[in-house]
């Protein structure tokens, strides 16, 4: 007999008090008023704008009175440092995240190594430099707060600030850049289950990621895709083998994909879509592999 569901009362911080919700662990580096770097660990940090333009961004939720929130509000810049899953790093994150301490008090206990930002150009808002980044990180997103977004930095209904952070630059260690390009291998990144029992934070390791292919039954026929492609723009011709490259694209996204390929072809002065051109378009990193 199947086990029944039972209701849980929804409390503040429901993601850790009323549910099990896996989260990332991100060290956010910001600039203090004296020019030093502050590190604050956060887990409520998620992709926000993911497609449709150049302003790809992350959403960060932080306590409004925290060093991190105050620094971002003042300087508008920060860096998101994704650190590897090591127990000593998690212990230090718990120390760095303890509320009520000044940045100077917290940073005395930091075991992380800071190095200069990799951003080019001059910082604004009276800064002499950008926030440092964490040398031990697997990858870093260097960001600028988009304060034009309709998210108030300090909602009246909560003690939190919501920051839409436009990603100016992503850097990562060469090993993981190679893995990203090859589509093989993943870094061991910690999983946070939050503060529970009013005593301790809970973290988890993850096992090796595994792939699951899209079912072949979901694919469209080549003839169906060819028909859609030829109708899209009469000035652009498609080889049948090129259409075969996108038969597994869900129908709801097919028009968008075809439009993207046609746009890329016209940009390069191409009038016939070949399988080779499709491979180039589908490889979003082709320009970085030369």
Question: Model-derived features: where do they sit?
Answer:
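Active-site-proximal mixed secondary-structure blocks
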Residues: 1-41, 46-226
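Non-catalytic accessory segments flanking P-loop/AAA+ NTPase cores
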Residues: 222-290
């Amino acid at each position: 007999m199947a086990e029944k569901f039972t209701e849980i009362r929804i409390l503040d911080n429901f993601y850790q008090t009323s549910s099990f919700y896996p989260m990332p662990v991100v060290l956010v580096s910001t600039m203090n008023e004296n020019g030093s770097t502050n590190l604050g660990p956060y887990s409520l940090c998620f992709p926000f704008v993911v497609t449709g333009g150049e302003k790809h961004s992350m959403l960060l939720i932080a306590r409004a009175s925290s060093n991190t929130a105050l620094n971002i509000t003042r300087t508008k810049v920060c860096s998101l440092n994704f650190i590897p899953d090591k127990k000593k790093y998690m212990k230090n994150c718990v120390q760095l995240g303890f509320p009520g301490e000044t940045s100077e008090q917290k940073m005395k206990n930091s075991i992380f190594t800071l190095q200069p930002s990799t951003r080019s150009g001059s910082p604004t808002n009276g800064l002499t430099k950008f926030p440092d980044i964490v040398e031990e990180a697997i990858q870093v997103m260097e960001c600028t707060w988009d304060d034009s977004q309709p998210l108030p930095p300090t909602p009246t209904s909560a003690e939190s600030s919501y920051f839409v952070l436009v990603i100016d630059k992503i850097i990562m260690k060469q090993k993981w850049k190679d893995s990203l390009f090859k589509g093989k291998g993943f870094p061991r990144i910690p999983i946070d289950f939050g503060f529970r029992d009013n005593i301790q934070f809970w973290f988890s390791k993850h096992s090796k990621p595994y792939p699951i292919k899209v079912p072949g039954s979901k694919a469209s026929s080549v003839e169906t895709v060819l028909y859609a492609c030829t109708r899209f723009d009469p000035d652009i011709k498609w080889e049948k083998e090129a259409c075969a490259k996108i038969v597994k694209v869900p129908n709801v996204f097919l028009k968008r994909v075809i439009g993207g390929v046609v746009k890329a072809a016209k940009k390069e002065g191409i009038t016939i879509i070949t399988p080779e051109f499709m491979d180039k378009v589908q490889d979003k990193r082709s320009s970085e592999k030369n």
